[in-house]
Amino acid sequence: MTRYVFITGGVVSSLGKGLASAALAAVLQARGYRVRMRKLDPYLNVDPGTMSPTQHGEVFVTDDGAETDLDLGHYERFTGVPASRADNITTGRIYQDIIAKERRGDYLGATIQVIPHVTNAIKDFVLDGNDSFDFVLVEIGGTVGDIEGLPFFEAIRQLGQELPRGTCCYVHLTLLPYIPSAGELKTKPTQHSVKELRSIGIQPDILLCRCDRPIPMDERRKLALFCNVRQTAVIEALDVASIYEVPLSYRTAGLDREVLGHFGLEHGEEPDLGRWQTIAERVRNPEGEVSIAIVGKYTGLKDAYKSLTEALTHGGISHRVKVNLEWIEAEVFEREDPAPFLEGLNGILVPGGFGQRGAEGKIRAARYAREKRIPYLGICFGMQMAVIEAARSLAGMPEANSTEFGETAEPVVGLLTEWLRGNELERRAAAGDLGGTMRLGAYEAKLDPESKIAQIYGSEQISERHRHRYEVNMAYRERLEAKGLRFSGVSPDGLLPETVEHVGHPWFIGVQFHPELKSRPFEPHPLFKGFVGAAIEQSRLV
């Protein structure tokens, strides 16, 4: 029998529902249960693909090409189970599907309403394809009281009535703020949040209380009394130094036991969290450290690069070192010399992105890394900027650029539908909307067996996730390779470049894909493990 755990949030946003859900899933996995995770996003966008990274954070891409919420990255990293398009849905996508059905006449002339049509669509999504799982954890985005979230709360309320008795559990994540002048944790915001939740028909079974100190017994009793839960169901979610300590913290607090008890399941043997303890110990007690610059355009919101920062942490864990990140806005390098910012650092990473803003700064960062022989990892846009830098500085093409920024005499980077045929720019197909030419999801690549990147992977065949609409122009391959920029990886048909590297440089690699999306704390991605290793070697030269 499949059991459902619905995770909601209250009091304030950004409490970490995604991490809480992923951590609970990890502990249940450690007990031997099969767990699936899903995310319901109340916003009206069809998906986050065209949303600003500075508002929404990163777009997490799945193997099947879905552009999803960054929380799915937490799910994958904590459980090791690849997510898919079937694990994330938005209000926008639900309305899009319902309106399409209405236009086709599928509803036979019925009046389309939020209840039952929208709520039924949400329930169908939650219940689909779960027969092989013991637990399905469903996170509802936003905060209780948000008007756009009401259809989702109504849908999970209905599921609580429609599913067999004892197969649903509602976990409510709230904040217990500490007021220094009063010298105590305040429970009133949580009481009001639960009151709001109960007003729409949902009685939480477990309170997961985010706090910076242990909850005194008096406050526990008060929360249990006024929120109508057992005292044992008031679980403290203490702040911890690393997100990889959260499963250990929840296990200590008894969250997994309370969930199992709610479903009438035996606790059985204690879960084996040995690997989580190893990870937490390595994060707490590194044997060294390196400093790596991230030269990006969305550095104002670190969540815009969430998978990237976690992948670097994984690389550090594998070497037992702490990775210190120096965030640098790429536009700064368009006005100032990069040297004062980059001197003394052990590696430079230029991540993915779109648009001309900051592009020249990223090109200057790539040049600095090449000339100073500092380890460089260029991801997606970062690879393209490294190719433009090589074309300008080494191959005698001072006007080399990307057609993303406008017409250019040397389009070394172009739209996937634009390629140079002779001296003419050929357009294979008319450009559509912003998503029309995007290359999304997992694609295979073959690596040059003599290349550094093939040695890093230990394989000549790889599969990685992509998210881009511009590509390095293969018409320039011969000229660039003559100057030492090896096209070390290509698509299986040989038509699209996937990786480049500077021959003779200690560690300078560009990849068109996003390796950070497949890195796990227990299985660091080879590129990030190699990059951090190269940074360690460079640190010994400083």
From Swiss-Prot:
Chain residue ranges for the region called Amidoligase domain: 1-265
Broadest EC class assigned to this enzyme: ligase
Any one GO MF annotation of this record: identical protein binding
Residues annotated to bind CTP: S13, D146, I147, E148, K186, T187, K188, P189, T190, Q191, K222
Reaction catalysis annotation: UTP + L-glutamine + ATP + H2O = CTP + L-glutamate + ADP + phosphate + 2 H(+); L-glutamine + H2O = L-glutamate + NH4(+); UTP + NH4(+) + ATP = CTP + ADP + phosphate + 2 H(+)
Gene3D superfamilies the UniProt entry points to: 3.40.50.880, P-loop containing nucleotide triphosphate hydrolases (3.40.50.300)
Residue ranges of domain Glutamine amidotransferase type-1 in the record: 291-541
Pathway in which the depicted protein is active: Pyrimidine metabolism; CTP biosynthesis via de novo pathway; CTP from UDP: step 2/2
Record-listed ATP binding positions: S14, L15, G16, K17, G18, L19, D71
Residues the entry annotates as binding UTP: S13, K186, T187, K188, P189, T190, Q191, K222
Keywords: ATP-binding, Glutamine amidotransferase, Ligase, Magnesium, Metal-binding, Nucleotide-binding, Pyrimidine biosynthesis
Active site: C380, H514, E516
PROSITE patterns according to UniProt: GATASE_TYPE_1
Activity regulation details: Allosterically activated by GTP, when glutamine is the substrate; GTP has no effect on the reaction when ammonia is the substrate. The allosteric effector GTP functions by stabilizing the protein conformation that binds the tetrahedral intermediate(s) formed during glutamine hydrolysis. Inhibited by the product CTP, via allosteric rather than competitive inhibition.
Misc: CTPSs have evolved a hybrid strategy for distinguishing between UTP and CTP. The overlapping regions of the product feedback inhibitory and substrate sites recognize a common feature in both compounds, the triphosphate moiety. To differentiate isosteric substrate and product pyrimidine rings, an additional pocket far from the expected kinase/ligase catalytic site, specifically recognizes the cytosine and ribose portions of the product inhibitor.
Family of this protein: Belongs to the CTP synthase family.
Function: Catalyzes the ATP-dependent amination of UTP to CTP with either L-glutamine or ammonia as the source of nitrogen. Regulates intracellular CTP levels through interactions with the four ribonucleotide triphosphates.
The name this protein goes by in its record: CTP synthase
Gene giving rise to this polypeptide: pyrG
